[in-house]
């Protein structure tokens, strides 16, 4: 008799789990990337792109600097301020950060909102290495 509550709880858990819908796994798509040298070529060729820097303002103006013409929109604010980029919907947006991690996140956010975005591999560290 003292095991009866345990049996009831176990049965409830089993029945409850049987009724759960199977969660479909969403395939993880690879984030599109671009090499720094290819970004430099696009800039030199005056291709109509948007350089979007997703670092903080302090980093943007800091020792690593920023690419001339880049627009600053920190990744932490990207979702809330996404509408500010609507005029660039038809452009390729090259997303930049310090080393490529935050820009990968920013690229995914932009793609989820229908933008044509690519992550600049290596970020400003790689950019400065090629200068």
Predicted regions and their residues:
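Rhodanese-like catalytic fold shared by cysteine-dependent sulfurtransferases
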Residues: 2-8, 15-49, 57-92, 101-131
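Active-site flanking residues adjacent to catalytic metal/cofactor-binding acidic residues
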Residues: 52
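Short, surface-exposed ligand- or partner-binding patches at beta-edge/loop junctions that are enriched
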Residues: 96
């Amino acid at each position: 008799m003292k095991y009866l509550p345990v049996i009831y709880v176990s049965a409830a858990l089993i029945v409850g789990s049987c009724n759960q819908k199977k969660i479909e796994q969403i395939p993880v798509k690879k984030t599109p990337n671009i090499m720094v040298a290819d970004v430099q070529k696009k800039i030199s060729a005056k291709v109509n792109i948007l350089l979007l820097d997703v670092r903080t303002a302090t980093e943007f103006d800091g020792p690593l600097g920023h690419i001339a013409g880049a627009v600053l929109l920190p990744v932490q604010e990207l979702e809330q301020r996404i509408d500010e980029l609507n005029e660039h919907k038809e452009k390729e947006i090259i997303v930049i950060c310090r080393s490529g991690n935050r820009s990968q996140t920013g690229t995914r956010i932009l793609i989820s909102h229908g933008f044509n975005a690519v992550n600049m591999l290596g970020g400003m560290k790689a950019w400065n290495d090629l200068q």
